[in-house]
Regions:
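Short acidic/histidine- and often glycine-rich active-site loop of Leloir-type glycosyltransferases
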Residues: 56, 63, 99
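Glycine-/charge-enriched secondary-structure boundary and capping motifs
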Residues: 86-198
């Protein structure tokens, strides 16, 4: 897999949180305004003009989460990966972009190839900002990577004979291996337990 996973999904979570914060401020303001108008309280109405200006100049808090926001709002396909593979003489046997989440897109790839797979939880590439934001939101970072989507990284398979070549390519990680279709699609957790991908 190229790049890292879960960042776009966590960027969406940050955007949604800031949207909620903004609308809560607007709702509270409208409630105060309605009360002040009903009471015809000119002092409160005057004070609410300042509060309205503050709401109108609302700036979301994206500090330390710029990478996540960019991954959500400005996704980029990793075109350089294809060039790196060509230069290394590696011909993928199957490839898909990760737009629906690693789990879903890996299942598509396996279905099309009539194969199964095993992926390792501890091999899934996750950026520090993604991990920190998952912790802040009390979300499981593996769940964000498996089910988040919109990362637009490349998920691909290569022949075993090319494994040594792939290790030298920056921003590409081997996260698992292909099996017979009858063995299904599973995540091997950090503790060694296997969980079926859904």
């Amino acid at each position: 897999v190229s790049g890292d996973l879960g960042a776009a999904y966590m960027g969406l979570q940050v955007l949604e949180r800031e949207k909620v914060v903004y609308y809560q401020q607007v709702e509270e303001f409208n409630k105060k305004l309605k009360e002040a108008q009903a009471d015809n309280n000119k002092v409160k109405l005057e004070a609410l003009k300042v509060e309205r200006a503050a709401i109108e100049s609302f700036h979301p808090d994206f500090a330390g989460k710029e990478y996540l926001i960019d991954r959500q709002l400005k996704p980029e396909a990793p075109g350089e990966v294809l060039q790196q593979l060509r230069e290394a003489g590696i011909q993928p046997t199957a490839m898909i972009d990760i737009s629906d989440g690693l789990s879903s897109d890996l299942k598509h790839l396996c279905k099309e190839g009539n194969v199964g797979c095993r992926i390792y939880e501890d091999k899934i590439p996750i950026d520090y900002q993604t991990a920190a934001t998952c912790e802040e939101f009390n979300m499981n970072l593996t769940t964000a990577a498996l089910n988040g989507g919109e990362d637009y990284e490349l998920l691909f398979t290569i022949p075993i004979s090319d494994h040594a070549k792939i290790e030298s390519i920056k921003n590409i990680r081997q996260i698992g291996y292909i099996t017979e279709a009858k063995l299904g699609e599973y995540l091997i957790a950090r503790d060694g337990n296997e969980f079926q991908l859904t």
